[in-house]
């Protein structure tokens, strides 16, 4: 029986990111926030999701959905460390429990393990593949290396070639760090020139501490006066990076290359949901399930203090719509400091991701986003362009018209 203290499950779709191989990965990227999550499961040497766990999750996840479409997201670690047979079982279970719903799958991979066989599987089953790649070789190989310290870029590019060969739909997730942030146009043009139509930028902001179990990355529950990891992008770098790329994109690529943060900005300008939790008023809509059934509030909050429970003991609905997760969701908005509440750009960023809110604002209140200066620079810079594109959309004209206006001015 459903707990009476949970929010209505019909308010929004249930969304859970799966970790079928836990934090296991064939790379050892120097900035990775997830690799050390293995320390949370030191009593288990086999961080692989069992067939039993896979079936329980699949059945419950589909049954909990109130929408006609269901999205399965496979993440890591490196999810391709599981065999194709595992994912064939996953597809069979999805078909078994679909009950008339449309099932879609997306997988995020570093791309180094892709083969013809994998790509044939993705093509035949219409999977979307996200590739983690940090731009040109020099910038990618600076941080994204093997456990032996060897570069990985060439293997990733081979993987992308195989995806193209088999006509698999793919997009890119690129980490912006202290090194590659200094080269925004070269970075952006690399993706555009390689035929990547959908691009997500993820700024690295991590703080270092020491936990008894060996973990070194901090959560918001840790002491706030702790140092940043060396790879972390600075607010100034982040603002300059976004503005420089936007100026190129808005003149050449609107409607052709889709950059997630630009799409989210326009959505918030229009007053519609941006679809990405970081730029939404509230978050907590996307949980994470580890290999053993442990469920956490968010992929960036896989810490003991943000564990919601285990699927063997509690239902997904009880965990993800329960009071602990609802409080986590509301806190994104209710914990904004005074400076944010007074800001004319709050509607566009909503404070961004809570994991980055560890600074004090100009009034001395805790909770300002570390990247605030960069975001404000970006939103102020793009405001007139967003105003124009908003007017075009409201008039039922394509926002890409802005390119013609800029060309003629």
PLM segments and residue spans:
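Conserved AdoMet/S-adenosylmethionine-binding subsite of the radical SAM
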Residues: 57-59, 63, 81-200, 207-209, ...
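A cytosolic small-molecule/anion-sensing beta-strand core signal
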Residues: 291
